[in-house]
């Protein structure tokens, strides 16, 4: 399949791209940084997902994975607005098979920085919107929401673990759609209730 992934130069995005390449898919990456992947089936576009005028002209994407994200003053612009633009540009079309948004456990818990958790909360709502709109193509759209703190399992998720989830949700799954899948090692169930003073 023809797979477009944003944020592929490092971390989760790079691991996802490599996982798809290892399964013989054609992968296109978009990232502000130079490519960290050398593979005959990989094409890299170095540009900012927020720079709408300079995004590459790519057609007939079958799998779209919105991974590009940040934790700084550009949270809303990168994590939400650019994700929406990328999806509307490349994902809402008849050739689409699956769209996956990389969210965050923070969207469920409200933890971390205000703008960050708000941007990821927007991703959850938008995921459901897209799932309804691409159902007519027989396509799915879900959000994969990793945790980012020390969890009850007392370990961190690796980028490779998240890549396996991404592959399952886009390539194996055909029926789960509009869902926000928490892969957080129990972060969201490690809830500490606080009584009012």
Model-based region annotation:
Residues 135, 140, 176-179:
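Short, small/polar-rich loop/turn modules that mediate ligand/substrate recognition or access, typified
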Residues 98-122, 127-136, 148-149:
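Catalytic loop of short-chain dehydrogenase/reductase
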Residues 67-72, 186:
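Conserved NAD(P)H cofactor-binding loop of Rossmann-fold oxidoreductase domains
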Residues 9, 17:
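N-terminal Rossmann NAD(P)H-binding glycine-rich loop of SDR-like oxidoreductase domains
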Residues 159-183, 188-189:
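C-terminal substrate-recognition "lid" of short-chain dehydrogenase/reductases
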Residues 140-150, 182-184:
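Conserved SDR Rossmann-fold cofactor-binding beta-strand/turn motif
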Residues 18, 84, 121-128, 132, ...:
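Conserved active-site helix of classical SDR/Rossmann-fold NAD(P)-dependent CH-OH oxidoreductases
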């Amino acid at each position: 399949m023809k797979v477009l992934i944003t944020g592929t130069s490092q971390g989760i995005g790079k691991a996802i791209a490599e996982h798809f390449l290892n399964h013989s898919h054609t992968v296109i990456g978009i990232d502000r940084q130079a490519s960290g992947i050398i593979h005959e089936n990989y094409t890299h576009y170095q540009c900012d997902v927020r720079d709408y005028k300079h995004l590459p002209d790519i057609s007939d994407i079958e799998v779209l994975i919105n991974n590009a994200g940040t934790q700084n003053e550009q949270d809303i612009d990168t994590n939400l607005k650019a994700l929406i633009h990328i999806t509307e540009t490349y994902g809402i079309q008849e050739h689409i098979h699956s769209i996956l948004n990389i969210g965050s456990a923070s969207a469920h818990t409200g933890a971390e920085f205000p703008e960050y958790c708000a941007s990821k909360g927007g991703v959850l709502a938008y995921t459901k919107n897209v799932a309804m709109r691409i159902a007519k193509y027989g396509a799915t759209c879900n959000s994969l929401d990793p945790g980012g703190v020390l969890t009850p399992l007392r370990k961190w998720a690796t980028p490779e673990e998240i890549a396996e989830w991404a592959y399952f949700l886009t390539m194996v799954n055909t029926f789960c759609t509009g869902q926000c899948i928490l892969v957080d090692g129990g972060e969201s169930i490690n809830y500490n209730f606080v009584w009012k003073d």
